[in-house]
A protein has these predicted regions:
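Flexible, glycine-/charge-rich segments associated with ATP-binding catalytic modules
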Residues: 12-19, 23-42, 53-147
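Glycine-rich acidic phosphate-binding loop
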Residues: 1-4
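Structured extramembrane domains adjacent to transmembrane segments
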Residues: 8-9
Length: 147
């Protein structure tokens, strides 16, 4: 087993629950290695977001379980493809009171056929990641900072 998402994310953020840590881990540009928006050259904080987004667009299976929490992506309704920065805006189910698991389990069933939808997905992933980082930077600099 590993250290789990909460312990990893807690190195740079302060999630109160395992479910909050999973939410952060699925958010583009957030990584446990730094609070720097967009991560670093070695860790951009986009991997789980990309995998979840591919599963969402293709209506594939995606579930993540860490600590006492689980997040499961549900098949999207309708044909319109939209990526959400906040994973809780996707159709999903979640639980925060499960038996504790010290590491992290990710279950995925992905179809990676190169289709028009997949090409669109790559474009949307890039746009969504860049927009999420830009919005968080803007929000951060609006806060008063006192020393």
């Amino acid at each position: 087993t590993g250290i789990g998402i909460w312990k990893s994310i807690n190195q740079s953020y302060n999630p109160k629950t395992d479910l909050e840590a999973i939410r952060l881990a699925l958010t583009p540009g957030i990584t446990g290695t730094t609070r720097q928006e967009g991560g670093t050259d070695r860790n951009a904080g986009a991997g789980l977001f990309f995998i979840k987004s591919i599963a969402s667009v293709n209506s594939d299976f995606f579930v993540i379980y860490s600590g006492k929490a689980m997040y499961k992506l549900l098949k999207r309704k309708g044909k319109k493809i939209k990526l959400h920065v906040d994973p809780f805006e996707d159709r999903h189910s979640k639980k925060g009171d499960l038996p504790s698991w010290e590491g992290t389990v990710v279950g995925i069933d992905l179809s990676l056929d190169t289709t028009q939808e997949f090409s669109l997905l790559l474009k949307l992933l890039n746009e969504t990641l860049n927009e999420a980082i830009k919005e968080r930077k803007k929000a951060r600099y609006k806060k008063p900072q006192f020393t």
